[in-house]
Amino acid sequence: MIEEERLKILTEGAKYDVSCSSSGSRRKNEPGGLGNAAFGGICHSFAADGRCISLLKILMSNDCVFDCRYCPNRRNADVKRATLTPEEICELTVGFYRRNYIEGLFLSSAVYKSPDYTMELLIQTAELLRSKYRFNGY
């Protein structure tokens, strides 16, 4: 089971990637209102046919070896660090998919240890999802 704190750190860290239409919402939650615009984790994208797709948007790690000044996950940033294994990401993705929360995964990462090492972990995650978990989602 993935601890809630690591999950929150890595979904909140992913909100800075603005490639999903619902990333970085500035709307505030109102008491008694429905929905949650402030929390990261689920983003929405659109398929070629115009259909809206819900995606789990998460970082594999926010623990970066580089110190790029523009990046909130840079090495010297004063943020809590977290990393998920490929297996943990797969279990999380499949669990959310089975509960009908998402249709796919939007996975990104800080450069953890080295660029090559990070890319191998990302590829391993995709391979596990498709082969071991037989995930056909987006």
Give the label of every model feature segment.
Residues 1-63:
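Flexible, acidic/Gly-rich N-terminal and inter-domain linker regions that tether
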Residues 6, 67, 101-103:
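Short loop/turn motifs at secondary-structure junctions
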Residues 55, 68, 107:
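Conserved, mostly hydrophobic/aromatic
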Residues 57-58, 87-98:
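Short, charged beta->alpha transition segments
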Residues 58-87:
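Canonical Radical SAM [4Fe-4S] cluster-binding loop centered on the CxxxCxxC motif
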Residues 94-108:
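Short Fe-S-cluster ligation motifs
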Residues 105-124, 128:
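Conserved glycine-rich "GG(E/T)P / GGGxP" loop and the immediately following alpha-helix
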Residues 131-138:
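Short beta-strand/loop segments at the ligand-binding rim of alpha/beta enzyme cores
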